[in-house]
Curated annotation (Swiss-Prot):
It comes from Mus musculus. Keywords: Coiled coil, Nucleus, Phosphoprotein, Repressor, Transcription, Transcription regulation. One of its GO terms (cellular component) is cytosol. The lineage of its organism: Eukaryota, Metazoa, Chordata, Craniata, Vertebrata. It comes from the Eukaryota. Residues 139-142 are annotated as: Interaction with P-TEFb. GO terms for biological process: negative regulation of G2/M transition of mitotic cell cycle; negative regulation of transcription by RNA polymerase II. Residues 112-131, 179-194 have a biased composition (Basic and acidic residues). Residues 207-276 form a coiled coil. This is Protein HEXIM2.
Length: 313
């Protein structure tokens, strides 16, 4: 009678599984087919046994055996190969931590500044670590120094040139526009000076010695003419400045003379007024008291005669 194999499914070794795969039909145990019970599972009594053709009798109630229904291939230990392989297969899952990454063009100005600052700090830290290890360092690849040089001179072109408001706001906008216009003018002047110097240097390098001497003499002649013209203009400016001063002095003297003459005439007028009043007072005393005037009678509206009084007309 064949011995009964009591083997657990969880204790099947990989060597036994591989041997079961290779051997295939050489030692494939036959599985006993149990009757299908659609109404419910039938429990076999503890003493009942299942007969197998090769292995003999196996107790039905033993928990260590793997009893699989259907025609599936089992390992010599009694467990299926597919179940073991499925249990040992490693399945990778995506990380639960999601990186909130956005393109550089979609970032705001503050976010761009923060990202650039982080990258510069990281680059500086890496360079320090490499320098500490004694490794050769390449120059830091950046063009920020060029942008800093240009930002000092370039004006702000994003300012809207609209009508200025009244009050302090208008004054502030006027001051800002004046400052921006001045900065823009200085930038254009410096740019023109640099371009002119570069062009002049290139033109001088391409000239011969005789041409340079001739240009030098021409420049000396122009310099002497400019100095003479400057002296002449200064002399004219001095004369023109002296003439208004003389005119002002003459006008001041004329005003003073007229003021003195006016004061003298006022005094004479007051004196004549005093003398005229004194003569009027002495004339009635020499001629005597005047006779009273006789008022002529007049006729009233009622036909009666009357006399005018001193206050009547």
């Amino acid at each position: 009678m064949a011995t009964v194999n009591h083997t657990n499914c969880n204790t099947a070794s990989p060597a036994a599984l591989e041997e079961a795969k290779t051997s295939g039909g050489l030692r494939s145990p036959q599985i006993a087919h149990e009757p299908h019970d659609f109404g419910g599972s039938q429990l076999l009594p503890s003493g009942q046994e299942i007969q197998s053709e090769d292995e003999g009798t196996v107790p039905a109630g033993d928990g260590s055996s793997c009893n699989i229904r259907g025609s599936r291939t089992q390992s010599p230990g009694g467990c299926s190969v597919e179940a073991v392989l499925a249990r040992k297969k490693h399945r990778r899952r995506p990380s639960k931590r999601k990186r909130h990454w956005r393109p550089y063009l979609e970032l705001s100005w503050a976010e761009k500044q923060q990202r650039d600052e982080r990258q510069s700090q990281r680059a500086s830290r890496v360079r320090e670590e490499m320098f500490a290890k004694g490794q050769p360092l390449a120059p830091y690849n950046t063009t920020q120094f060029l942008m800093n040089d240009r930002d000092l001179e370039e004006p702000n072109l994003d300012v809207l040139h609209g009508p200025s408001h009244s009050g302090s706001g208008g004054e502030n906008e006027a001051g800002d526009s004046d400052g921006q216009g001045r900065a823009h003018g200085e930038f254009q002047q410096r740019d023109f000076s640099e371009a002119y110097e570069r062009y002049h240097t290139e033109s001088l390098q391409g000239r011969s010695k005789q041409e340079l001497v001739r240009d030098y003499l021409d420049l000396e002649r122009r310099l002497s003419q400019a100095e003479q013209e400057t002296r002449r203009l200064r002399q004219l400016q001095g004369c023109s400045s002296r003439q208004p001063c003389q005119q002002v002095e003459e006008l001041a003297a004329e005003v003073e003379r007229l003021r003195t003459e006016n004061q003298r005439l006022r005094q004479e007028n007051e004196m004549w007024n005093r003398e005229g009043g004194y003569c009027d007072q002495e004339k009635p005393a020499s001629e005597g008291t005047p006779w009273p005037k006789v008022e002529a009678p007049f006729q009233t509206h009622t036909g009666q005669l009357g006399h005018r009084e001193a206050g009547d007309r």
